[in-house]
Amino acid sequence: MEPAVERKVPEQEEQLQPSHARAEDAPPAAVEEEDEAEAEESERRNRELKAGLHPLRRKLVLWYTRRTPGTRSQSYEDNIKKIVDFSTVESFWVCYCHLARPSSLPSPTDLHLFKEGVRPLWEDPANRNGGKWIIRFKKAVSGRFWEDLVLVLVGDQLDYSDDVCGIVLSCRFNEDILSVWNRNASDHQAVMTLRDSIKRHLKLPHTYLMEYKPHDASLRDNSSYRNTWLRG
């Protein structure tokens, strides 16, 4: 089966540079905040284990965006609606079994599955220094790959998973687009390792074309999927 929309893309130089910044280089207040959040997550998992449930490593939130074509009266942020959150395997399946499949969603529509505390906005503090890997699919096969990507995120299976903020399904008129958002667009090793991990978990060919775009570039050109920087 051919999963992708075939696209001819000119070669570009890789514009990401390796970064040596790590958690230990963060300001003390930021480190303290991360430690508190991790402690809260640990307490939550312990409570759920005692209740006989199967806790996820991170609580996740599902968001929905639907903009009526030709309507510009509302901002993108105003159009984002929270659907549900879940933190256990059991609550995930209850939610997922009732969700509409990509093939039944109108265009343009976006579904966002993000870690709790991170909003699916370029400007969110967790996202503003990051970017996203972009994967384009024919509409006939996108549902399968979206489900696989959801299960990968829920299972915390991606490499550099702490660097991953969330995933997005964008239903468009001629194609569907999946994207994986990460925190640090300047960490070349993390960005490229994440790309390889996505391909491996989705069983995409090694030569399959993916695109990367930093969120600050999206802010400049006000576009999610045009003018991507890195292809590979």
From Swiss-Prot:
A single cellular component GO annotation: eukaryotic translation initiation factor 4F complex
Entries under InterPro entries matching the protein: TIF_eIF4e-like, TIF_eIF_4E, TIF_eIF_4E_CS
Q: Which family is annotated?
A: Belongs to the eukaryotic initiation factor 4E family.
The ranges of region (Disordered) come to 1-49
BP-aspect Gene Ontology terms: regulation of translation; translational initiation
Subunit structure as annotated in this protein's UniProt entry:
EIF4F is a multi-subunit complex, the composition of which varies with external and internal environmental conditions. It is composed of at least EIF4A, EIF4E and EIF4G. EIF4E is also known to interact with other partners. In higher plants two isoforms of EIF4F have been identified, named isoform EIF4F and isoform EIF(iso)4F. Isoform EIF4F has subunits p220 and p26, whereas isoform EIF(iso)4F has subunits p82 and p28.
State its role.
Answer: Recognizes and binds the 7-methylguanosine-containing mRNA cap during an early step in the initiation of protein synthesis and facilitates ribosome binding by inducing the unwinding of the mRNAs secondary structures.
Picking any one GO molecular function of the record gives:
RNA 7-methylguanosine cap binding
The gene from which this protein is expressed is NCBP
* The keyword RNA-binding belongs to this UniProt entry's keyword annotation: yes
Q: What is this protein called?
A: Eukaryotic translation initiation factor NCBP
Gene3D superfamilies for the chain? RNA Cap, Translation Initiation Factor Eif4e (3.30.760.10)
Q: Where is the composition biased (Basic and acidic residues)?
A: 1-11
Could you list this entry's UniProt keywords, alphabetically sorted: Initiation factor, Protein biosynthesis, RNA-binding, Translation regulation
> In which residue ranges is the amino acid composition biased (Acidic residues)?
31-41
Task: Give the PANTHER family listed for this entry.
Answer: EUKARYOTIC TRANSLATION INITIATION FACTOR 4E HOMOLOGOUS PROTEIN, ISOFORM B, EUKARYOTIC TRANSLATION INITIATION FACTOR 4E RELATED
